[in-house]
Amino acid sequence: MDDEIAALVVDNGSGMCKAGFAGDDAPRAVFPSIVGRPRHQGVMVGMGQKDSYVGDEAQSKRGILTLKYPIEHGIVTNWDDMEKIWHHTFYNELRVAPEEHPVLLTEAPLNPKANREKMTQIMFETFNTPAMYVAIQAVLSLYASGRTTGIVMDSGDGVTHTVPIYEGYALPHAILRLDLAGRDLTDYLMKILTERGYSFTTTAEREIVRDIKEKLCYVALDFEQEMGTAASSSSLEKSYELPDGQVITIGNERFRCPEALFQPSFLGMESCGIHETTFNSIMKCDVDIRKDLYANTVLSGGTTMYPGIADRMQKEITSLAPSTMKIKIIAPPERKYSVWIGGSILASLSTFQQMWISKQEYDESGPSIVHRKCF
């Protein structure tokens, strides 16, 4: 691979797509993984009838569009829309010709086999890329933190995973998936704001609530104590101005919303919280490596960006683990993009260059080549 032809790194998340060039320290393009279609045909005069909008443009015209996310729980469910998102990534965001650059894509751990084959097929057949590779998101996050051993708790918009990794290899038998992430927290915040008398219902209003969540929510170190504080004083109240100028006030919702990560019963789910899931994942590993996992617990993804989450994880895992165990929660400041950053690091390593699946290999073997070359 020539040096002057930089590889493209595309991290397709359920909520946001992060894209850029290998070797960069941050993605050039970050936009919502949304495809919007007009709700009403033919009323938009002078807009030049487009049948679909992607990303920020869909976001800004959301009032007249129906918004759909083609990636649910980390896994692509709508390939036609996914193709639109990739097309938008290459041609509008990065402004590159995909047939000139190798492309590194990311996938959720435990992604169905058919999915990675379909990704491979679209890259080679629709976009004619010269080479491509599919990497597991959590492994990339660990690389970005400068480690090869540790457990990654990766929580984005659509799905949360705990992935133990030893010497660079994910341990599939110990990976746990939790279908509870940012989007569920946004929905939950919509619900508890409704109880306060504010009404948010449409897909467009959901985006407003997501913004409230990102700006004002935090994780309480002690939930019961925080609820007491919120009940007895107004010190935790914050206000937020809606796009129409109306100002709303939120109090205990600020920490009740992300508390669902630790108590999924708030959402009517029977699963364990993220702390217990992390602990269970570690317990599924060989007894000899657990110490290394406890001492290298790495948080990754946008849903780990709440203030207070690392301290709370430290507290919860300490109470679950053996009392003598050293526990360290690593929460890098750039963890929102650590999957992308790990991909950028990986794709620019000289030792990685022989790992790419080339167009020639694809033509000889078909989509199943991805299982042999990408782990």
Swiss-Prot record:
Q: How is it modified after translation?
A: Oxidation of Met-44 and Met-47 by MICALs (mical1, mical2 or mical3) to form methionine sulfoxide promotes actin filament depolymerization. Mical1 and mical2 produce the (R)-S-oxide form. The (R)-S-oxide form is reverted by msrb1 and msrb2, which promote actin repolymerization.
Residues modified to N-acetylmethionine: 1
* UniProt key word Hydrolase: yes
- The answer, when asked if Secreted is one of the entry's keywords, is no
- InterPro entries reported in the protein's UniProt record: Actin, Actin/actin-like_CS, Actin_CS, ATPase_NBD
Location(s), subcellular: Cytoplasm, Cytoskeleton; Nucleus
Residues modified as Tele-methylhistidine: 73
Pfam families xrefs: Actin
Please state which protein family the record places this protein in.
Answer: Belongs to the actin family.
An additional note in the Swiss-Prot or TrEMBL entry is: In vertebrates 3 main groups of actin isoforms, alpha, beta and gamma have been identified. The alpha actins are found in muscle tissues and are a major constituent of the contractile apparatus. The beta and gamma actins coexist in most cell types as components of the cytoskeleton and as mediators of internal cell motility.
Name it: Actin, cytoplasmic 2
